[in-house]
Each structure stands twice: as structure tokens, then as C-alpha cells.
Amino acid sequence: MQKFLTTAPVVAAIWFTLTAGILIEWNRFFPDLLFHP
């Protein structure tokens, strides 16, 4: 359990960084597909 408590924040931080980066890149190349009126 101790190993999970030390690993989980690192995995979460990497996951959120990757997700944010993918969304930013997608929004840069396809700005009209992300936001529909």
C-alpha cells in the first residue's frame, strides 16, 4: 500500500500532463471540432 501511495500522484501528474498536452495540440490543429455552437 505504501508503494501505491507514492506512485499514484506521479502517475496522475503524468496522465494529466499528457491529457492536457493532447487537448492543446488537438485544439491547435482542429479548433473547430472541439467547440460546437
Swiss-Prot record:
One of its GO terms (cellular component) is photosystem I. One of its GO terms (biological process) is photosynthesis. Keywords: Membrane, Photosynthesis, Photosystem I, Thylakoid, Transmembrane, Transmembrane helix. InterPro entries: PSI_PsaJ, PSI_PsaJ_sf. The keyword Transmembrane helix applies. The keyword Chloroplast does not apply. It comes from the Bacteria. It is a single-pass membrane protein. Pfam families: PSI_PsaJ. It is found in: Cellular thylakoid membrane. The chain crosses the membrane at residues 4-24. Belongs to the PsaJ family. May help in the organization of the PsaE and PsaF subunits. This is Photosystem I reaction center subunit IX. It comes from Synechococcus sp. (strain WH7803).
